[in-house]
Amino acid sequence: IMVVSTQSAVNASGDIAGLVNLAVAETNQGYANSGVEITLQLAGQYTTSYVQSGSFSTDLSRFRGTADGYMDSYHATRNTVAADVMMLLINNSSSCGLASGIGSTASTAFAVTHYSCATGYYSFGHEIGHLQSARHDPAADPTNSPYAYGHGYRSPTSAWRTVVNTAIFDAV
């Protein structure tokens, strides 16, 4: 994964490098806890001078755009560092995150996360989960494509949940 942070997120976080490393570690622990044999590796982290728009969908579109004049240079950097997934960390508390969709290709493997939700709320791993074709829990999203069992899960006692389950509590 390659992570790009806005200057606003960098300033607000106090330690963006530590936050990104923790987000990667939490995501990898979630994979391990679920028996998913994937290891997320940080290909690089960068700070952009891009000024957030105030809209997650606009920021995501501008991040994905290759020739729109916003964050175009990061696409070449992505190729250089061989990152499969791109994450933009922003300082916008209107939501915790937004992925390009359920499932992804090289041109759609992009997500945006509010820096303060990236860890603890597990939104960093949550948005990556969507890019890997995982959906929210069936109560929140009953769609069964592309996988009938590709949903978040919460244990019957609520003692734990998967990262794409929409219930908010600590155990993951």
Residue ranges: model-predicted function:
Residues 1-105:
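Fold-level signature of zinc-dependent metallopeptidase catalytic domains
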Residues 45-61, 108-172:
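The catalytic-center signature of Zn2+-dependent metalloproteases
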